[in-house]
Design a protein with these regions (language model features):
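Hydrophobic beta-strand segments that make up the repeating blades of beta-propeller
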Residues: 77-81, 138-143, 190-194, 270-273, ...
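N-terminal secretory signal peptides and thylakoid transit peptides that target proteins
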Residues: 1-15
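Structural signal for beta-propeller blades
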Residues: 96, 147-149, 227, 278-281, ...
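Gly/Ser/Thr/Pro-enriched helix-cap/hinge segments flanking short amphipathic alpha-helices
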Residues: 50, 356-358, 390, 398-572
Length: 572
């Protein structure tokens, strides 16, 4: 995991056709991100159980997630914890934490009352989805050796149904997961990116024995684990279809996952990032099986053909083509890769042309999202960074353990500009970041960020100023389709601005995202048309919608009344 790669400034970086700028807002917005975690009452501290033995599980987690568990229109927060001692002991067991959004800028720890401690789990990630279509989101917590499924009882409490449901992922190292409906039967299935076959008994000595510098072992030291795919049987149980579906045939060093329809055929595909081996892109064959096509699609490796430390990922349309592009974050001395979807089932490595290469070369990226942070109508790119070695400066004096975050502003024509130093001191504060989830926790129309930090307190970065431009958010509610509407495609037209999005599963690194779709509108105050194609094939069209509001749309019915209370601004 600490191996270096030669920086290849490839002269043949792939170029793509220029497009008109997507931006519909002011050229620059005075957006600042302010860390309000402390003033909001979030006292959580991640424990990584750091030890001289350098157990690999110490450095890989953990994640976080937004979940409106009580369905009051306010995003609540789940933070995954690690382990406090050796992974094979139960002493001093830690717990993860659920914080309820009070609607006044503060949160209350309701973990014990809700019953979602996940105590004793060496926690990694979280995934949120309503697997039984009862209207209340359920919580899946990933970990080393096992995972936990908490069923939402609808009364503020959860029940551990892992054994009954059959989704324990036993003896595997689950990193990230995605709820999605791969067979379009109206029920959410579950795919898990599993990491490596590591154990405390095989925690080999890696590093430089001369000066006694120990490091975490490279993933190549261990055998990779294949992904897991669980099919939802519709009766509260799941069947492991990993092998017969084709998803679990090949081992991988899986860390991140996103499900999206890369070829716009109406069926969700699976992309999994792998650490120091080719990434997986599983094409949905529409018959319950998948075919791995990473190399032929152009996303297995970057343009230089080297294996890289694939960690976080996301998919979104960044050019207005109506096709979803991909981002993959990597270790420092590598590059975060931006793969542009050029159609016909193929992606091109646009990392150099997009101008994200230089800034990402020096940092280790984990959580990442495409997001319109300034609401100008173009999706920008966020990355949470942090090295994997706490003693990295003893190897490389110029590299630090804690690292700053990155924000790249989409300036159109497939080009991004690094604006990280314009977003305030809290945004630049170095941390050992892992998971990241984007969500509008105060319902003011601009996107906030929760970041989980390894061995540190989380950061809740409130977006101040992003709503100077106009915006529009949608909560999609499936009826014939799965209730979360994962797989739905949306087209929004506001004047000359045409935006595309789809309801995806997974994203980022070990983290669960805001379930609502967010659209920045720039200076447009009216959305002329919203077109939704549901996974069932049904079409919904709405016209002449005012901007600056959150709407709930139910399949087959249209607009439905749901509360989305605005949270008053509170000083940090």
């Amino acid at each position: 995991m600490i191996s270096r790669r030669v920086f290849l400034k490839t002269a043949g970086a792939v170029l793509v056709g220029s497009r008109a700028s997507l931006r519909g807002g002011a050229a620059v917005n005075a957006v600042r991100y302010v860390d309000v975690a402390g003033s909001a009452g979030i006292s959580f501290q991640h424990d990584n159980a750091a030890s001289p033995e350098k157990y690999l599980i110490e450095t890989m987690g953990s994640g976080c997630g937004w979940i409106d568990y009580d369905q009051n229109g306010l995003l609540d927060l789940y933070l995954v914890n690690g382990a406090s001692r050796r992974p094979n002991t139960s002493k001093h067991a830690l717990r993860s934490a659920l914080y309820r959004n009070n609607g006044d800028g503060t949160f209350t720890d309701v973990t014990i009352k809700a019953g979602v401690e996940a105590e004793g789990l060496v926690g990694m990630g979280a995934a949120v989805g309503d697997y039984d279509n009862d209207g209340f989101p359920d919580l899946f917590v990933l970990g080393y050796g096992r995972c936990i499924l908490f069923h939402n009882n609808g009364n503020g409490t959860f029940t551990d149904v892992t054994d009954r449901a059959g989704v324990g992922n036993i003896r595997k190292w689950g990193s990230s997961a995605a709820w999605f409906d791969y067979d379009n039967d109206g029920l959410l299935d579950l795919v898990i990116a599993n990491y490596v076959d590591w154990s405390p008994e095989e925690n080999f000595w890696c590093g430089d024995k001369g000066p006694g510098l120990r490091s975490y072992c490279h993933p190549d030291v261990y055998r990779g684990q294949p992904p897991t795919l669980y099919h939802n049987n519709g009766d509260g149980t799941f069947s492991d279809v990993s092998k017969r579906s084709g998803v679990g045939i090949r081992p991988g060093n899986g860390l991140g996952v996103v499900t999206f329809d890369y070829d716009n055929d109406g069926w969700q595909d699976i992309f999994i990032t792998n650490d120091q081996m080719p990434n997986f892109l599983f094409h949905n064959n529409r018959d319950g099986t998948f075919r791995e096509i990473g190399y032929s699609a152009g996303v297995a490796v970057g343009i230089d053909g080297q294996f890289e430390a694939g960690m976080g990922t996301d998919a979104a349309d960044t050019t207005g083509s109506g096709r979803s592009d991909l981002i993959v974050t990597h270790l420092d001395q590598q590059l975060a890769r931006l793969y542009q979807n050029v159609g016909e089932g193929y992606f091109e490595d646009a990392t150099f042309r997009s101008k994200i290469s230089y800034a990402t070369f020096h940092l280790s990226g984990f959580g990442t999202r495409f997001m319109d942070y300034d609401n100008d109508g173009a999706r920008d790119l966020f990355m949470a960074n942090g090295h994997v070695l706490d003693n990295i400066q003893r190897y490389h004096a110029e590299t630090t353990y804690a690292e700053p975050k990155l924000m790249f502003r989409n300036v159109g024509h497939g080009i991004f500009e690094n604006v990280s130093d314009q977003l305030g001191p809290d945004f630049l504060l170095p941390r050992v970041s892992r998971g990241a989830a984007i969500g509008d926790f105060d319902n003011d129309g601009d996107l906030d960020i929760i970041i989980s930090n390894n061995g540190q307190a989380p950061q809740l970065l409130r977006n101040d100023g992003g709503n100077a431009n106009h915006w529009f958010q949608l909560l999609l509610i499936g009826t014939r389709s799965n209730r979360d509407a994962v797989g739905a495609r949306v087209k929004v037209t506001a004047g000359d601005l045409v935006l595309y999005d789809e309801k995806k599963g997974g994203m980022s690194y070990q983290s669960a995202q805001d379930p609502r779709l967010h659209f920045g509108l720039g200076q447009h105050t009216t959305v002329e048309e919203v077109e939704i194609k549901w996974p069932s094939g049904e079409l919904t069209k709405l016209t002449n919608i005012k901007s600056d509001q959150i709407l709930a749309i139910e399949e087959g019915k249209g607009l439905v009344d749901r509360p989305f209370p605005r949270v008053p601004l509170r000083s940090a």
